[in-house]
A protein has these predicted regions:
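Intrinsically disordered, low-complexity serine/threonine-rich repeat tracts
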Residues: 26-49
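Positively charged n-region of N-terminal signal peptides that target proteins for export
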Residues: 1-9, 21
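Short hydrophobic transmembrane-like helices used for membrane targeting/insertion
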Residues: 5, 14, 45-46
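Bacterial lipoprotein signal-peptidase II cleavage site
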Residues: 18-28
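OB-fold single-stranded nucleic acid-binding module
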Residues: 45-453
Length: 453
């Protein structure tokens, strides 16, 4: 499927050049001139023939440091300085990055998008970016062409993406993770981290391409973590994909907890939240208990690599995207992906929910870390009749019964809480810390229990 997508994208790129205007003059009948000058032309000294321009395929196949000749179209330039200019170029069969091309200030002014140029230089590579170095050029009169952006969102994380290196591309539905100015304040490059499907990617606002006075520079500077954006730019490479952004459109933002709760089932949701605990990782999935200062959420079987699962800590900040769902009264996020935001943590204190037992107010705290004090043990029952699976715990308070659970994927049989609960007797008094899970009614998942003497 990915190979099919890559093939279709290549076709789209070629078609995007089909509309390029040609301004070549019509051919003249030169038969007479040829016949009349046959003798003369055969006696002339013929100079070195003009080297034919390479195709993009031939350029990519050329050895590093070898001389190359290409004809291509200017798409954008970085700032001219010291008789040099760096140019982003593209042709119907591929794109090029021309680093510090020799160029007068007068010619730099003519380097407008669509202009055709013939370039002679040397093929080089720097940090994965294939480029033309030590180049010279001449303008080629005739056709002009401006590339349309090719959407390569589906190629993120694949080996096919690099085949589009330096092309003018677009990415849709990207989530903002981080915005960082190169020197800590506006004026220099902006390093942008965006996420898609649980993976992060580096982008850059290159100040010599789109400087501090441009709209894109200003817009990127105002982005907030969790914003959803569509991006266009040149598919530059720096130790991995590092697109140079030329435009950004904000299409959404991370939800508040109130907006998440109000969202209808099957609605796509994006939240910034903090992981407080998780069930056992398996089959590249993990179930998370999360809470911020605003409220809590339960993320069911989010896509997650083992490496990411092992990196989670109590309070880790994540950006999660998935779909709102309700199962047996439990609001949860399903079919989710998430990205860990490094260096930020939040762990709330448990709130004492004892006084809310039996009230309608309890559900407003669904999935939060809660404390229940002075609860009396009524019954302990193993799910399958013996230790190893979940433990169903019935606790009473003021004559009413409430169902709790020791969820084995949260607190396994070898954990202290599992052992402690298994040793309880009817009539024991306990204080309980739990996540306020719901199953047809309040059914908290216990993660700590304290017998009261």
């Amino acid at each position: 499927m990915k190979k099919l997508i890559a093939l279709l994208l290549t076709l789209v790129m070629v078609l995007s050049f089909a509309a390029c205007a040609k301004t070549e003059a019509p051919a003249e009948d030169t038969t007479e001139a040829t016949e009349a000058n046959t003798t003369e032309t055969t006696t002339e000294v013929v100079g070195d023939p003009v080297a034919p321009a390479m195709s993009h395929e031939e350029y990519m196949a050329a050895e590093m440091d070898s001389e190359i000749v290409i004809e291509t179209y200017v798409q954008a330039t970085q700032s001219w300085w010291d008789n040099k200019i760096t140019v982003y170029c593209q042709s119907p069969d591929g794109a090029y990055f021309l680093y510090e091309l020799a160029c007068s200030e007068e010619d730099a002014a003519k380097m407008v998008p669509g202009t055709k140029i013939r370039v002679t230089g040397f093929k080089g590579e720097w940090a994965g970016e294939v480029e033309v170095m030590d180049g010279t050029f001449e303008f080629v009169e005739g056709d002009t062409c401006i590339a349309e952006a090719t959407d390569v969102t589906e190629l993120l994380g694949t080996e096919e993406l690099i085949a589009h290196q330096n092309e003018f591309v677009s990415f849709t539905g990207m989530s903002v993770i981080d915005i960082e100015y190169k020197n800590g304040e506006p004026g220099d490059d902006i390093y942008v981290t965006l996420a898609k499907n649980g993976a992060t990617y580096s982008f850059c606002v290159e100040r010599y391409l789109t400087g501090p006075e441009t709209e894109v520079y200003t817009t990127v500077g105002t982005l907030k973590r969790g914003d959803t954006v569509d991006v266009e730019g040149f598919l530059y490479w720096y130790e991995g994909v590092n697109t140079h952004i030329t435009s950004v459109t904000v299409t959404g933002a991370a939800m508040s907890h109130a907006d998440y709760i109000a969202a209808a089932d099957n609605t796509e949701v994006t939240l910034i939240t903090n992981v407080q605990a998780w069930q056992s990782w398996w089959d590249n999935k993990i179930t998370l208990y999360c809470q911020t200062e605003e409220g809590a959420c339960f993320i069911y079987e989010a896509a997650c690599s083992e490496e990411v699962a092992n990196s989670l800590g109590n309070g880790s900040t994540i950006l999660v995207t998935g779909y709102k769902s309700t199962w047996e009264g439990e609001a949860e996020i399903v079919d989710a992906t998430f990205v860990v935001i490094p260096g930020e943590f939040y762990v709330p204190e448990a709130f004492d929910a004892t006084s809310l037992l039996g009230t309608d107010e309890m559900i407003a705290h669904q999935n939060e870390i809660a404390l229940f004090t002075g609860m009396t043990v009524k019954a302990i029952e193993y799910k399958n009749g013996e230790p190893g699976d979940d433990i169903y715990v019935t606790l009473t308070k003021d004559g009413a019964d409430y169902n709790f659970c020791v969820e084995r994927y949260l607190t396994a049989p070898d954990s202290e809480v599992y052992t402690t609960v298994g040793s309880l007797q009817a009539g024991d008094t306990v204080d309980v810390l739990c996540f306020l899970y719901w199953y047809q009614e309040m059914n908290p998942h216990i993660f700590h229990i304290m017998p009261v003497a």
